[in-house]
Amino acid sequence: MDINLDALVEANRRYTKEGHVATYIPALAKVNPDQLGVCIYDLKENKEFSAGEYDVRFAIESISKVPTLILAILDNGIEKVFSEVGTEPSGFAFNSIMNMQINHKNKPSNPFINAGAIKVVSLLKGKNDEERFKRILDFYRKIMNDDEITLDTEIYLSERETGDINRSLAYYMKGNGIMEGDVTDILDSYFKQCSVLVTAKDLARLGAVLANEGVMPWNGERLFSVETATVVKSLMTTYGLYDESGAFSVHIGLPSKSGVGGGILSSVPNKCGIGLFSPALDVSGNSVASMKLLKEIADKLKLDIFR
């Protein structure tokens, strides 16, 4: 791969000073904000290229919505999942209930806002949180080829302690017949999936599977269908970066998903998966330095899918 990742990481590290770590979840406030790492899984060479803090573990947070959506599709099929969750941008904050109230919709707008992600968790097979989360964790380990992916109990407890808005979303859906099941049990699985520790390398592998149309490039095994890969990448392109999704598509142009743990997952169809980590965030909850670094990588390698 014709790119000096080490030099790019160091050139963009200064942007970590322009953001702030997430503080509304106490455990995330303890993370060193100066970190920046990247990994690219190149499909053509079937090889990983890494630089910076690419192997530092951090909370996956909202990026978890991507692999969990894939698992829900495997459990239920695309038609069933999207009869229960929409595919439209919400026009409201990621943790808002307003879209369902104002538009009188009987389902969340999309699977990447919190209401939609909670609904997706409720669709997973498993009779309780223990079974459901075991399936989530096993799937994450498989799709990211990392058996060391684990739950961070401290972050999970922080998520649960500060999760009242998510509880309100879940109870609203339950009370209006939008979601079935035990709310507390479903939310426990949701809080846990957000609290799983991954690395930039893990995210690059996840992106590579999506880029490779559902086939894990390290062993050639098909994990999910071409159609599923296409749908998920389309959703990532539309609203994967919270309120910055539109600007991100214009300026960088890659199917991506961010999380307040500082990670960004990107998938470049038929080319590569990219994982980035830098915990200092902008006002929208996206990693400042990771976005700057990703822009440079996309420009130098001509990865923008719209150009």
From Swiss-Prot:
Gene3D superfamilies: DD-peptidase/beta-lactamase superfamily. Substrate binds at residues 62, 114, 159, 166, 190, 242, 260. It catalyses: L-glutamine + H2O = L-glutamate + NH4(+). The keyword Transit peptide does not apply. Keywords: Hydrolase. The keyword S-adenosyl-L-methionine does not apply. Homotetramer. Belongs to the glutaminase family. This is Glutaminase 1. It comes from Clostridium perfringens (strain 13 / Type A). The lineage of its organism: Bacteria, Bacillati, Bacillota, Clostridia, Eubacteriales. The gene is glsA1.
